[in-house]
């Protein structure tokens, strides 16, 4: 029985192995305790038979029920077999000792004192629920009796035993058999759920099988009514079958929990084992909570699908009963046959419930039952609902309880009033419902007792439904369920007072085989099962027990007695059979044998129950022949019974064989269908592959043509808006053949002094060439140089401030003498009608030569918030626009277009284009590399590509930026100021950039660490003094755009004591090949407050070298130094943070370069660019106007994202940019320009730095200089075609480089080789530069280590994929795939910046060939197409190649889909 198994489950909880430690979750502990407490229910109580039972008299008769043998002992005490003495019906009596009621009491529903005599809440609720339900697949409750000591539940007897035992015996079942049982379980549960009743303890131990293998759901000790307003709370049931929400200790809905249990049962039926099982209860509960189990592969697809849906951890996702009933697994098998044709279940939807008239008509006992059923709901609330006109559950349950009461009352009355033999022939109830119609409590039913019911609204008159009989004495029993107004009480007979023969008792204790045989015979009889059947069965079984000695005397007695003697016998017969059992037995024997005698024909197949009543038996002398005939007839009946049983068995076997054959045929058909479907899919796949292959070939061919077209140095016209000039546009050549500032003065002036980057068109100054040859360097075009112009003296630097030339390493050929630059700047501004300033001017008011004062005024204007929008546009147009966000093409194009329209006529741009063309002709490094974003094209496009909003002054200053922001002259191949088109003012970093410093996303301005290097230089004061400081050397590393790959490559070269140089080198190194993090489109560097201490010596000579320069007073210089110091102090923390950030970048491969902007403020004669860091969250509190600063056109190799520091115009203060401040700036400029020994910038990239100690500044920067220790070297001669630089670069390959790739940066005029040369040149001031470089290689430092992360990136770590998809489409596809992989768990730490087309992530080692793979993806928008760069930051090559293959496949697939959509 289920009770035994329940007790075993209870012991599992109590076992020592299940004592839980505090380390485990409190939730599981709570559930374990809750499940343990749940055993205190009726069906789960651990109660052994009381020892007092042995001392007291054993109860053998309960009302009309005669108790028989004990069927089992378990948690409920015991279960005994019983037989109804009037109908012969068998039942199972569950005996619950009242001494255990206190243990059963639920603390939550504790009784009040006046209700102390009532049954425990759990038992009472179980009784009420079983009264309500009547279904062929649910065990019925026949009766409830009680006496002083015990409670008796008369339950339907089910002889087949537990499904659990059957499963243990048979093992896993065939699917058709398992589904047959499962359907019956679901039907029964569905019926329960219609009443909102949940079983909550479904398991094979509580599922019983009758003789015909029909399921009966038993044990409702855990059942509960679920009220809509309230979830169930009790954690109950068996842990193996309990749902996760019950195990988790949550409030839950009962119906989904029952479905979970049914899913476990279905799994067990099909597999023979449980999905969740463990000896340790804690581990078991955790397994259930996880919901993960192994699905056996041999199960059918439908079975797997249904089990999976039923065992969903989330109850909301779990399948419903209705969906289960229509599932294909159940649909493919016929409905189970139910042998209870006489039983009809109640359709609760069609119940016609009559309105209750008043409170007086409400049965008080049923009202109490409803209160218990609804979780001790207040009776007043229930009464109000019963009297309401609307339908409600209370009314339905009231009706059902009333119906149950009337049925059992009529049966009881019938039992009390009828003592004749016919009463034994009434139909026995197989369930709690019979075909009896009950109108309501007022009208009663069609029985003779209707009138008695009307006498009182309650049939319980003076007693409570579940109260002990107080009037009964001793062991007097009371029927507490169906007691009429004058209940009949039965004295309990006991083993001490019974006086009947022992053999009669033996007949009562029939074995289970006898009962099974009896049930078999009755099952195969006609619809009616009456007392005759039971009696005949008893006769048939007598030979098995007593032999002929019992049967032979019976007929003789009947024949020798007359009617009078029979009546006498009828009155006197009493015994263990009950009132009339023995007489019934005698009469049946007479009936059978007399019929046989009268009718010589053999017994027909008509059931015994349909035989006519026997006539009075004739009196005759028995003969041996007669006895022999009758014995033969008896044996014939037994034989007939065996034949019927055999027929049943054969039919069952035939049905099973038929089902097996159907199942086999169905499987074969399914396999054939699957094979056909697979073959069809294979053919379709082959066709698709062929089509895809053809399309791919066509696509590849078209893409190759397109790529070749784009890779051409002369085919970039379609990259930007139509009014931009392409890189290949020929600009009027300046015709310069020399770097002498006096050569081609007019041409230089017209072009704002932009030098030609092409070595073929530039003649390097002879003096400079000699100087370089002294150091063993041939001045030849370097594949990696920013400026191919040669080094110049301070005078040249002065001119380069006005018309900055790119430094040797940044632009070897752009070096010019200061006089030439000065003249170029002055003439350039005049001749171009202020075109260089036009971009800066919003009023377009300058059609005259630009003075320094005017320029300063414009600078101040740009710093003010009033022109913040313009600043954004300038930044977009000059640098950031080259690398537009792939999802904001329109916005970026608008900004660029606006800028272009304001600056369409810039002579400087024309010269830059010309220079670019020359450079392209000379050096293959200028070929566009698709791995750089659109921003990198800025250097390749003609100067017209970017509007020069700052004017000529801006252009020149942009290249003069002293800041470590790597002066990138690359893009504007022209012009001493490769910063053409970029506003001189610092762009302030948007606050996002600062916020990203900690988060390591993408920072859009030069790395704060690098920028702070500027601050140090400024603070050192010695920054760039006359010719002693070679800016090119210092910024040679800046040849490449700042990227995560370069990071801090040159930091390792800095000397420990020279913080300033360290910062400078750091910044330069940070600008590497792919500064793709920097491009902050249209955003202003608000975070890096302008420490406008970096000034640029804008040497203004209006028409030639004879410009008079006035020196500003020393107090300006003091102011400048003070500000520098203040900025340095403010930014100390920021600098440290940035350094730490770089180290983290090395580890995490996130390489998020913190960028900052710079503002130039005139406070000294020398002008340097100070990093605007005080506004950053890390730095200081200084807050420059948002968007007041601007990017100058990138002078870096690629221009990608680089937000280089922008040299400030002299004396540009951070005032609101009012135009009326131009005069002040003019005066300040005069003072500044007159200082002869300070502020002359050696290179276009270099910014001048005001300092009271020019000597110190010389020493500071000399270590980076290639020039000898002299005041002002002359411009060197043009570099020869082959320079040792390349070899030096090769030697330096092993050194941590800023650039991740070898060879040329195709967007840069500087190659890695030249940059390596630069790093070699970064040595101590007095020694040979090569020695210094070698020394830097052999002297490790923390910065060098931090730079290693970027240097690790090699060409093999970058894969370029070109595609016809637009950048937006590409980002969308990749983002979608990454999200899927992220959910799948095969990728983590995904960071997607849609604006800049940057994607990073980490692939765990188990998905990346054993080593964690960190990667980054850059998407470059090429207008009508795009290019994707997959970069390996960390991991093995195999995993990286797999990633590249996957990305390539995704892109090709999307291209094919795109073609198909067309």
From Swiss-Prot:
CDD domains: STKc_BRSK1_2. It catalyses: L-seryl-[protein] + ATP = O-phospho-L-seryl-[protein] + ADP + H(+); L-threonyl-[protein] + ATP = O-phospho-L-threonyl-[protein] + ADP + H(+). It is found in: Bud neck. One of its GO terms (cellular component) is nucleus. Residues 65-330 form the Protein kinase domain. The keyword Acetylation does not apply. Residues 636-715 form a coiled coil. Residues 1-26, 41-69, 412-450, 471-540, 598-637, 992-1031, 1095-1230, 1269-1321 are annotated as: Disordered. Residues 1131-1153 have a biased composition (Acidic residues). It comes from the Eukaryota. It is an enzyme of class 2 (transferase). Signal peptide: none annotated. One of its GO terms (biological process) is filamentous growth. Pfam families: Fungal_KA1, Pkinase. Its main location: other. Disruption phenotype: Leads to elongated cell phenotype. ATP binds at residues 71-79, 94. Residues 510-526 have a biased composition (Low complexity). Residues 610-620 have a biased composition (Pro residues). Residues 428-440, 471-487, 527-540, 1165-1176, 1197-1218, 1292-1302 have a biased composition (Polar residues). SMART domains: S_TKc. The active site is at 201 (proton acceptor). GO terms for molecular function: ATP binding; protein kinase activity; protein serine kinase activity; protein serine/threonine kinase activity. Phosphorylated throughout the cell cycle, except for the G1 phase. This is Serine/threonine-protein kinase HSL1. The gene is HSL1.
